[in-house]
């Protein structure tokens, strides 16, 4: 439970909890008996209450084999996505004859907990890209810093700066193209790189760098 909130908190995503239940009008769509389903659904309700989390109930949203707690994330455009999920499965273990040995040395049926924190990597990345609109936080950005040179006279100094950044495990790119510095800056901003470092002859002479963040 805690890992879900920690994981999505790092991504600055607000979560809403949904208790996904059977469709009471169509019990034939689900595996197992009604008693097991009632027990599993009530256990998930208790988990939500114990954690003092507001939740909504969604009949018909359960998997065909189990009820579940779905964590719904809201992206920067206000759209809702199901991300993490916790399922209490009382049906599949029996179908695979899964048992454990209880305290009396006897075989006993088990209940299986399915937990998907992130789900598929591809789906998670699509949600996170939409959420940040490409402007990833510094720690998540594929390129954290981009070095822009004013001319080729400053390349030696620029490479010294790059070496220091790479030694500090900062993901860095180097733009030493024969283009105007204005164009390089505009392209860096369009790429939504957190920090642009601009190096000209003034910076070389002073042994400094000029830093421009994504906000401009």
PLM feature segments, named:
Residues 1-216:
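NTP/phosphate- and nucleic-acid-binding module
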């Amino acid at each position: 439970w805690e890992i879900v909130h920690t994981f999505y908190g790092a991504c600055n995503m607000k979560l809403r909890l949904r208790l996904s239940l059977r469709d009471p009008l169509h019990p034939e769509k689900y595996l197992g008996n009604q008693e097991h389903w009632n027990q599993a659904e009530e256990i998930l309700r208790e988990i939500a209450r114990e954690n003092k989390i507001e939740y909504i109930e969604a009949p018909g949203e359960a998997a065909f084999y189990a009820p579940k707690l779905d964590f719904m994330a809201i992206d920067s455009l206000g759209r809702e996505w199901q991300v993490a999920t916790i399922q209490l499965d009382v049906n599949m273990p029996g179908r695979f004859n899964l048992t454990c040995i209880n305290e009396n040395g006897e075989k006993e049926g088990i209940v299986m907990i399915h937990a998907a924190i992130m789900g598929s990597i591809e789906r998670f990345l699509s949600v996170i890209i939409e959420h940040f609109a490409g402007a990833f936080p510094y720690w998540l950005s594929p390129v954290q810093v981009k070095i822009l040179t004013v001319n080729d006279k400053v390349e030696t100094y620029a490479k010294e700066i790059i070496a220091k950044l790479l030694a500090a495990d900062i993901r860095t790119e180097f733009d030493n193209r024969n283009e105007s510095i204005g164009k390089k800056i505009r392209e860096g901003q369009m790429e939504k790189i957190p920090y642009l470092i601009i190096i000209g002859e003034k910076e070389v002479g002073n042994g400094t760098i000029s830093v421009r963040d994504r906000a401009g």
